[in-house]
């Protein structure tokens, strides 16, 4: 949509400066292939209070973010905005391809819809926030900043990012609901097996 292109052009013309560039570069690098979320999730596994959170995050990132990256994007095949507009293209090429700072330049064959950075950020933020409610505000701030980098550097349309936010929150919530039900079922199964063993011993 033309309004999305105009919005991205406006961001470049009005918000870009060396300080913001440095900060946004770092954030968008951390979101590459969701590696930072996997790293934190694996750390969660080592602590009893966060183990369940870690398992839920890893499962969601693999299944949902992975599906978006390897399947969903190729269903829609939406071309990235900087490939549709000469002004955006010239900016990205000058900024990234000839510099490749932090290796954040999207591959030539990658598609735009929906934003994987945004989806992963809000999946992770939603799951962690539900299990650890006190972390809600910082989680959502970080996820929002991560998502904004995809607009600050015109790798995605605004609607790509909005879709990533909504999908991340929805499936993050669904992941927790499913995980809680599975946990209850597993606990019941374990208790049932223990009871059967006790009954067999008593006989």
Where are these regions (language model features)?
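Small-polar-interrupted transmembrane alpha-helices in polytopic inner-membrane proteins
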Residues: 59-75, 136-150
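Membrane-water interface at transmembrane helix exits
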Residues: 44, 68, 72-77, 129, ...
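Hydrophobic, aromatic-rich transmembrane alpha-helices
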Residues: 37-48, 121-129
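N-terminal transmembrane-helix/juxtamembrane module of multi-pass inner/ER membrane proteins
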Residues: 1-38, 69-105, 194-203
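Membrane-helix interface segments
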Residues: 19, 49-54, 82, 131-138
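Interfacial segments of alpha-helical transmembrane regions
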Residues: 40-71
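Membrane-embedded catalytic cores of phosphoryl/pyrophosphoryl-handling enzymes
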Residues: 96-203
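Alpha-helical transmembrane segments of integral membrane proteins
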Residues: 24, 52-60, 135-138, 159-163
